[in-house]
Amino acid sequence: TFSMLLLVMSNNFLQLFIGWEMVGLVSYLLIGFWYTRESAITANLKAFIVNRVGDFGFLLGIAAVLYFAGTLNYGQVFAQAPLLAQKHLWLTGHFAVAAPTLISILLFAGAMGKSAQIPLHSWLPDSMEGPTPISALIHAATMVTAGIFMVARMSPLFSLSVPAMTLVLFIGATGAFFMGLIGIVQNDIKRVIAYSTLSQLGYMTAALGAGAYAGGMFHLVTHAFFKSLLFLGAGSVIIAMHHEQDMRKMGGLARYMPVTYVTFLIGAFALSGFPGFAGYFSKDAIIDAIRVSTTPGATYAYWAVLLGVLVTTIYTFRMIFLTFHGKPRMDAHTREHLKESPWVITLPLVLLAIPSLVLGGLGLSALDYGHFFGASIVNRVGDNPLLQGAGEFHGTWQFFLHGFTTPAFFLVLSGIAITWVCYILRPDWPRVLRKWFYPVVYVLEHKYFFDDLYFRGFSMGARRLGNLLWRFGDGGLIDGVMVNGSARCVRVGSSVLRRLQSGYLYHYAFAMVIGIAVIVGWLVWR
């Protein structure tokens, strides 16, 4: 809490960086809470190392701010923003990068690490190794939100750079769709929710890239509640299942855990963006803002986030049907002891279900189409897609009714229907579909091979390079030539000189005669 408050309330880049690093450190420690588990230690180390890559870019961005603006104070930097647009960094004699573009891209590298954007996203699913309440905290209110907040806070700089905004939009929209696809093939209930976080972070990032900063922040707020609800609901299920997390070994839990089921269902509808729930108001505003955005690549981003609605609904209700519906698939002992979790677990679910229902409608006017953020968020003149959509906004009630006519609503219905048919009506179909689309499933199950690339390409590659350098550099050059080579030269030279010291007097007399002859000859010749 202290770290996030420091990050949010800072008024200069130095304080921001301190809070930024403290959030990363605390998250690293929380992920490794079960320090006796090798998987937990590997996960927190992975999170720490991946974020170091992003934080290196973030630190370079802060250095660029100091170089171009001469200060780290927000107010002074933002006041100089129009002047920064006229400054450039010449990389070659013919190629220069505008200062706002360089600063924004470097700062966004940090956001890619903290907010788990492609390609620095791979640490987030592994953070599930921590306790479930820790997962809820990291995915809802701390680590992953830091990058989204930072980009929105730096909107005066990002808005000056079309290339940076295009990059942010492309990365976000790609993550919103393709990270959601991985969630469809996951069987661990917590990992499904983890990949939903990656997808929803993609929506927030895409909103920032489209210039809808308030929309991204609004979705961050609503997402915090229903994502915490889903994680804690998953924790309730895991406790009832005696710490089993494989959804294939669940089923039929709705009759045993009614409170968990109803609250989990509310979170599922909010995540899917069903009209009336909190997620609908924030997500549909983002989709609409991207539709009218002038950022290059907005057409691709619009279709990516729109199809992401279908993907989100499929993995969400696949989780619902596998966990709470159908025939019980757990062992007899677990089934005999199934019961609702105690009130200390269900009460937080009920409390989180309330904002997951009503927060979107209550906050839409102020957060999305109002002036809640004031001067904290800056757009290019005439380039705020939320304001363009505000002309069609006639109040929360009309926005709610409009939701039943949008393409996103029909995609939600289609996703629910698809999962109901595949997992309730015809539960044998998923196995058939898996065989038909096995190449696609194989790629998704291997998470687009990012982990393989990082482990075999970078980690193992670095080790092989290190071994090569050690063998030829340290062993061959330093030890072989410089250290042992010097000793070898001394040994060879001393052995030659040793033969000259024979101990016979006539050898020395002969050497003296030869020496005198050489000297006399040289004097005569000269």
Model-derived regions: residue spans:
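Long, highly hydrophobic alpha-helical transmembrane signal-anchor segments
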Residues: 185, 199-209, 280-290, 381-414
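Hydrophobic transmembrane alpha-helices and their helix-loop junctions in integral membrane proteins
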Residues: 1-19, 24-341, 355, 361
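Alpha-helical transmembrane spans of integral membrane proteins, capturing the lipid-embedded, hydrophobic core
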Residues: 21, 52, 56, 224, ...
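Aromatic-capped, Gly/Pro-kinked transmembrane alpha-helices
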Residues: 365-410, 421-526
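Select subsegments of transmembrane alpha-helices in polytopic membrane proteins
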Residues: 136-143, 342-352, 505-511
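Membrane-water interface at loop-to-transmembrane-helix junctions
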Residues: 124, 339-347, 399, 404
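Membrane-embedded and interfacial regions of multi-pass energy-transducing membrane proteins
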Residues: 52, 68-72, 77, 172-175, ...
